[in-house]
């Protein structure tokens, strides 16, 4: 077993060096860290193993990322752009979801297995979308707000649908009760946390450490309560972020976010989340598929349905071709939700190993390639503006 000093030296070296090296090639930081994870992980050079400590740190990184995503959502802009976000989310949910279900039927997965395919086709990756928008400084823009809000709405619905699929897969009969509990859970968080936070954060106005402690405290309360109901921790973390954001003034928001939480999250925990994602990815499955037709059908249809639905929705909303393209591409990446869905589907016997491997390949390709393409388009757009 490696010394933890050695492990953390390797991790910090990657986090510090690799993104700066690959930045010259317009490769986003999250992609470069994931690629590094694939190379050093057990399916690559086997330099590091993913142990329980790294898994815990990665899980906390995902929680921090989702909380910061919620905290970054400008609630006033969200209210102004809710209708537009809803249009994008409906296109991005229904078209790929229906397409995924039909392809599942074509592949002979049955009703529940096809529902699982619908979840996988419809799912976004809030983590990757938010990280790309953050890196490109687009979170606060109108396009960024619409895309992030729509991604969140879609992921909430797909997580709920995944929960329903799990209930059906294990023969559950309380799906309606679960959905009611989930709605109540989200409602209570959005109503209770803002008023509570205004009072408590006001008491600790000049005590920054205590403010951070309070934020972490409510995040974990929300997660623990959510787990009792059966709600994924990232949902609770995101809702907490939105609720806390509602309680803050702009100055408090910038101070809490930029001076404290961003440093904690992006300085350590969030990069570990992406590094571990790469380390746990067996890239060889892409090259070892016995049925290439299955991979091509799934990959081409999933990417095409997502991109087309996003492009059309943003065109309806009046954006130009470049922004439609960027927005359409940002609906494509799949990683956490799709891999969780695939893993659960295999455990429940809803899909076989061949389908599972295909979904892993889909997740790896979309999560790795999409950020690179988006950043290249964004840089090209900026260069064109500079020349003009």
UniProtKB/Swiss-Prot annotation:
A cellular component term, taken from the record's GO annotations: plasma membrane
Example GO molecular function: antiporter activity
Positions of transmembrane segments: 2-22, 27-47, 53-73, 81-101, 102-122, 146-166, 175-195, 215-235, 263-283, 294-314, 325-345, 354-374
Biological process terms in GO annotation: proton transmembrane transport; sodium ion transport
InterPro entries tied to this protein: Cation/H_exchanger_TM, Na+/solute_symporter_sf
UniProt topology in membrane: Multi-pass membrane protein
Keywords recorded for this protein, A-Z: Antiport, Cell membrane, Ion transport, Membrane, Sodium, Sodium transport, Transmembrane, Transmembrane helix, Transport
Protein name, as recorded: Probable Na(+)/H(+) antiporter 3
Family of the protein in this entry: Belongs to the monovalent cation:proton antiporter 1 (CPA1) transporter (TC 2.A.36) family.
Function statement: This is probably a Na(+)/H(+) antiporter.
Localization of this protein: Cell membrane
Principal subcellular localisation of the protein: membrane
């Amino acid at each position: 077993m490696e010394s933890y000093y050695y492990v953390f030296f390797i991790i910090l070296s990657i986090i510090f060096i690799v993104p700066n090296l690959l930045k010259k090639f317009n490769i986003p930081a999250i992609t470069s860290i994931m690629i590094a994870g694939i190379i050093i992980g057990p399916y690559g050079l086997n330099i590091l193993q993913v142990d329980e400590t790294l898994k815990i740190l990665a899980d906390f990184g995902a929680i921090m990322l989702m909380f910061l995503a919620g905290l970054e959502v400008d609630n006033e802009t969200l209210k102004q752009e809710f209708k537009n976000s809803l249009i994008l989310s409906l296109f991005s949910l229904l078209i790929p979801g229906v397409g995924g279900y039909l392809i599942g039927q074509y592949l002979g997965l049955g009703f529940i297995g096809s529902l699982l395919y619908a979840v996988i086709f419809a799912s976004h990756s809030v983590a990757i979308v938010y990280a790309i928008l953050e890196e490109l400084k687009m979170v606060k823009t109108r396009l960024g707000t619409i895309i992030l809000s729509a991604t969140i709405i879609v992921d909430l619905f797909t997580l709920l649908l995944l929960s329903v699929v799990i209930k059906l897969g294990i023969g559950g009969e309380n799906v309606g009760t679960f959905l009611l509990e989930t709605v109540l859970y989200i409602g209570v968080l959005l109503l209770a946390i803002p008023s509570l936070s205004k009072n408590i954060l006001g008491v600790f106005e000049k005590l920054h450490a205590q403010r951070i402690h309070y934020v972490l405290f409510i995040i974990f309360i929300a997660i623990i309560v959510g787990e009792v109901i059966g709600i994924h921790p990232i949902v609770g973390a995101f809702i907490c972020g939105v609720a806390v954001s509602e309680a803050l003034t702009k100055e408090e928001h910038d101070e809490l976010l930029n001076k404290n939480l961003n440093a904690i999250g992006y300085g350590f925990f969030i990069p570990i989340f992406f590094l571990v994602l790469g380390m746990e990815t067996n890239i060889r499955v892409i090259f070892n598929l016995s049925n290439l037709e299955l991979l091509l059908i799934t990959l081409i249809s999933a990417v095409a349905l997502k991109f087309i639905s996003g492009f059309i929705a943003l065109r309806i909303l009046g954006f130009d071709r470049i922004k439609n393209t960027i927005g359409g591409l940002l609906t494509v990446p799949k990683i956490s939700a799709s891999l969780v869905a695939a893993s659960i589907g295999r455990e429940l016997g809803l899909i076989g190993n061949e389908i599972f491997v295909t979904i892993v390949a889909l997740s790896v390709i979309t999560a790795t390639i999409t950020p690179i393409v988006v950043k290249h388009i964004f840089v090209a757009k900026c260069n064109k503006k500079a020349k003009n």
